[in-house]
């Protein structure tokens, strides 16, 4: 096997140490969840190419991070056979789809997030994953309700870039930064489960966890 020169070897070892560290894994996990939850807002503000660039960079970084700590990673659960079958079936639908290129683009998008999700599952334990989702969901819910207050109560206008109609002052369902009330409602329900898990596992201060539950409950009610 060809060995790199010593000076390059030192750089490679340093890079592997950094990319394989717990801090980098935490940052990449948070960035992945944040990108997934903010995909609509990102696509509407920086465009599809901008979102694609973010996803490509994330895939490259998580691939390098996974390679750097491969020896320390073990499968923590059984292989999700049902998910694998669903993914395979989804890809097979390309052959009889009337919109093959659109199907290929959508399935590639799904595959990217599948890879990113597998990375999180491999490098973080359950409590760490819950905390990652909890932190990101608190952020997106606070941003959503803040923008709804600004558009619906303060300025009484819409925010077309994020499809926020400013309905808070008219008692109509709000959309937040997710583009639709249904999407916001789903995120709020997931947030409620996540925050309740944080409270039960005591992975977050009690007052902070209860406040998060109240926030998610309010957002869920306003999205109906």
Positions of PLM-derived features:
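Hydrophobic core segments of transmembrane alpha-helices in multi-pass, intramembrane catalytic enzymes
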Residues: 52-62, 105-117, 182-198
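Short hydrophobic alpha-helical membrane-embedded segments
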Residues: 26-34, 82-84, 107-108, 184-188, ...
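Alpha-helical transmembrane segments of multi-pass inner-membrane proteins
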Residues: 134-162, 169, 176-224
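Structural signal for the C-terminal ends of transmembrane alpha-helices
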Residues: 60-73, 118-128, 194-204
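Transmembrane signal-anchor hairpin modules in multi-pass inner-membrane enzymes, especially those
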Residues: 1-92, 128, 135
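Transmembrane alpha-helical segments and their membrane-water interfaces
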Residues: 94-148
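Hydrophobic, membrane-inserted alpha-helices
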Residues: 35-39, 61-62, 87-90, 113-116, ...
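Membrane interfacial helix motifs at helix-loop boundaries and amphipathic/re-entrant anchors
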Residues: 37-55, 92-109, 148-184, 221-224
């Amino acid at each position: 096997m060809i060995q790199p020169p010593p000076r390059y070897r030192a750089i490679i070892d340093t890079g592997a140490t950094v990319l394989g560290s717990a801090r980098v894994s935490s940052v990449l996990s948070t960035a992945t969840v944040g990108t997934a939850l903010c995909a609509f807002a990102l696509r509407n503000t920086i465009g599809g190419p901008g979102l694609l660039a973010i996803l490509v960079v994330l895939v490259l970084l998580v691939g390098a991070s996974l390679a750097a700590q491969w020896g320390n990673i073990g499968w923590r659960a059984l292989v999700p056979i049902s998910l694998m079958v669903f993914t395979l079936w989804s890809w097979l639908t390309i052959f009889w789809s009337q919109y093959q290129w659109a199907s290929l683009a959508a399935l590639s998008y799904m595959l990217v997030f599948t890879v990113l999700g597998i990375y999180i599952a491999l490098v973080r334990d359950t409590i760490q994953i819950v905390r990652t989702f909890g932190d990101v969901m608190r952020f997106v819910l606070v941003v959503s309700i803040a923008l709804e207050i600004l558009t619906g109560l303060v300025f009484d206008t819409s925010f077309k870039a994020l499809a926020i109609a400013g309905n808070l002052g008219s008692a109509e369902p709000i959309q937040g930064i997710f583009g639709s009330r249904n999407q916001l409602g789903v995120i709020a329900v997931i947030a409620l489960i996540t925050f309740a898990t944080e409270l039960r596992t005591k992975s977050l201060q009690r007052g902070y966890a209860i406040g998060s539950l109240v926030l998610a409950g309010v957002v869920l009610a306003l999205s109906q």
